[in-house]
Structure formats: C-alpha cells, structure tokens
C-alpha cells in the first residue's frame, strides 16, 4: 500500500472526504474543536448550547483531554493535548453528527466496524487516528 499525504479542510466538501483512502496521512487545515464525554452529555442529554457555529466554523471534532485554559480576558490558551479512546463516544455519535454536522472525528484506538457502518458511512463522515503518545515529539 502506498501512503499519500493529503491536506483536508476542517470544513471539508463531501468530495474531499470521499477521495480519502485507507492509509492516507491527513493534515487538517482550519479550526478543530475538542469535545469528550462531558461536552457530549451536556449538549445532547441536557440540551446545553454549543458556543460555536457548527459545522460552519468546523466539522472536525478531536476526542482528547481537556486542553484549554481560560485567560482573564476570556481568550483561551491551548496546552498539550492527548487523544482519548473514541469507542467510548459511540452511543452519542449519531445524535452528535446530526446536531453538529461533524464530518471528521479524530481520536485514538479507532471504532468498531459496526460503528463505521452505522454512524460514519450514512453521514459521509471519516474517522482519523492520531499518532501514538510521544510520536509527535519524535517527528518534530
């Protein structure tokens, strides 16, 4: 299998997603938001407002550790991020994709083939696996 390097917008066209192939090395261009269990629960189970215009601002959700620090002026600083296992989000994904328009989910560990067939394929979405711990530092 030959590996391709692909640039993908975080507000991708369906054609760009459909053009991806297994094994592609994908670089994301644009804004990506983090959300894990707490955000999913508040947004979906408690109907909390999402403070972004999704998917206009971004259709890329990174499953990772809480990563932002709120500054006194209300801005945010991003520290280091650590991917978290995406299989834990499966029960929320259909509703999450519908509510947010998410087309790109980034995380670690992948999902089951059933999840891909039930959630990603019907929504024209893609799952991207991150590199392992410490690999980012190794690669520079």
Where do the protein language model's features map onto the residues?
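Short, charged beta-turn/beta-strand-edge "cap" motif at the junction between a beta-strand
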Residues: 14, 25, 31-35
């Amino acid at each position: 299998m030959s590996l391709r390097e692909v640039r993908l917008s975080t507000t991708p066209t369906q054609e760009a997603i459909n053009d991806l192939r297994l094994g592609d090395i994908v670089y994301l261009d644009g804004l990506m938001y983090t959300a894990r269990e707490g955000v999913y629960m508040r947004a979906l189970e408690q109907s909390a407002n999402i403070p972004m215009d999704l998917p206009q601002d971004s259709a890329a959700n990174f499953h990772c550790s809480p990563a932002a620090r709120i500054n006194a002026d209300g801005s945010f600083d991003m520290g280091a991020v650590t991917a978290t296992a995406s299989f834990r989000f499966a029960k929320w994904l259909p509703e999450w994709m519908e509510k947010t328009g998410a087309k790109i989910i980034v995380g670690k560990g992948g999902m089951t083939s059933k999840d891909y067939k039930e959630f990603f394929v019907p929504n024209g979405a893609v799952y991207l696996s991150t590199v392992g711990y410490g690999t980012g530092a190794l690669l520079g």
